[in-house]
Amino acid sequence: MELRTVVATVESGEQDAVLKVLQIYNQEKSQCFTFDDEEREERKKMAQLLIKFLERELQPSCQVTCLESIRILSRDKYCLEPFTTEEGLKTLSRHAGIDYSEELIREVPDLEVILESLKCLCNIVFSSPRAQELTAEARLVVGLTKRIKLYNERSLPHEVKFFDLRLLFLLTALRVDIRQQLAQELRGISLMTDTLELTLGVKWMDPYEVATEEGLLPPLPRQETERAMEILKVLFNITFDSSKREVDEEDAALYRHLGALLRHCLMISADGEDRTEEFHSHTVNLLGNLPLKCLDVLLTPKVRPGSLEYMGVNMDAVNILLDFLERRLDRGHKLKESLTPVLNLLTESARVHRQTRKFLKAKVLPPLRDVKNRPEVGNSLRNKLVRLMTHIDTDVKHCAAEFLFVLCKESVSRFVKYTGYGNAAGLLAARGLMAGGREEGEYSEDEDTDTEEYKEAKPNINPVTGRVEEKLPNPMEGMTEEQKEYEAMKLVNMFDKLSREQVIQPMGITPSGNLAPMENAIRDMADERSSSDSDLGLD
């Protein structure tokens, strides 16, 4: 059907005729996501007419059809202007049942009308900064949270709940002020935690342990999984700075309650491997936002038959995180987005919980036996992580190195032993530890256990490559002293030329363990030696 015909019919305002042409238009354009530039002005006019038409007293079926047309038009970012006015957004939010009002009694729209209105709002808010600003001013988040609070009392269809949560996610992702309003004024962390608990349908065995039947937990149904993931995304947005600030006991209890639910999310699967991976990914992202002291709930559950026990502690959740990490490593896709959250989570957990660190150390860095291959060669988890230490992405290589460094109790010698000095140099240089030593950290004094194979090979291991190198013939064998001196000077001159032309910059290690240009390093060492001589009265 010609667009101008649709526009003319809508302009006439006759309800039955409008309903008929819009039904045809919606059917023809239901899968249309790209639009011709030639008809842009016609679409804008149609959008204006539809918003005005929707303000009239219409039958629910006509409202739904009109909203379906608005949803189709809202896919075109060049036609959003009629929808991004105060009046337009108020009309849509009223039909969605979420317009902010101080009145206690409000008319409840038809459920299909609510659903289509929510879909329209999601499209418009996602694409229009002006709409985002107006929804913040209109306090739509208040109306949304009021309805979410009633999920336990009202029987709403899955799709309405899903798009409620999707709209809330978009608002909190795109507007810092709405994020803060939900977290603080509307007590959003508590509300969304309760909503997650309701969605998962859990029962509690202890304050921070979800009750489970013996054996494998059944997969979370598809609809509940979809809603749970939207809730996790909203919670991620409003807890973004939680790990960086101190929390009082009341907040700590709330975060521990949430952490226990997230542990349960890790322990269950969704409908299919891909959906489970996505569900666990959102769970890991949110766990990384929790205050560090609240991560102890990952280890809280008692050891039961079938649990993975280490040092008397239930390590099921930590082991699942480690398996999740290895799957992400093997997939090798978008490493920064997929790896850094779980690496950071495991690193911080290992830093603050001794049992977690020792368990991860046993899994990732078992006592060395293979000393013939470089640390980055092979298929073990250690090999895969060491390979990341020279990754092109700075964040990825830093996270991998930091994780292994913490497992080594931030001991330089132990770190070099497992990774090789060449791989370790980046982190050591950044930390000012090139001269060796150890970072400040609270770690137990247990010793690293060396295998017989490692002890036997240790004198022959090249610290740079981290393996026993084959003995190569001496290139200077058979040379006279004059020839050796000539080759040495030739090498010095080559380095000097490269340095003067600024192709390379010779670096040295300062007494503090930092890298510095060679002349600076030599000067610092001379100053320190002079200071030492003065202290000894050798002037």
Swiss-Prot record:
Pfam short name (any one): Ric8
Keywords: Chaperone, Cytoplasm, Guanine-nucleotide releasing factor
Protein's cellular compartments: Cytoplasm, Cell cortex; Cytoplasm
GO cellular component: cell cortex; cytoplasm; plasma membrane
Residue ranges, compositional bias (Basic and acidic residues): 521-532
InterPro entries in the cross-refs: ARM-like, ARM-type_fold, Chaperone_Ric-8_A/B, Gua_nucleotide_exch_fac_Ric8
GO molecular-function term, one example from the UniProt record: guanyl-nucleotide exchange factor activity
GO biological process: G protein-coupled receptor signaling pathway
UniProt xrefs under Gene3D superfamilies: Leucine-rich Repeat Variant
Primary location: cytoplasm
Annotated region (Disordered), positions in chain: 507-539
Signal peptide annotation: none
Coiled-coil region(s): none
Family designation: Belongs to the synembryn family.
Function (record text): Chaperone that specifically binds and folds nascent G alpha proteins prior to G protein heterotrimer formation, promoting their stability and activity: folds GNAI1, GNAO1, GNA13 and GNAQ. Does not fold G(s) G-alpha proteins GNAS nor GNAL. Also acts as a guanine nucleotide exchange factor (GEF) for G alpha proteins by stimulating exchange of bound GDP for free GTP.
Name of protein: Chaperone Ric-8A
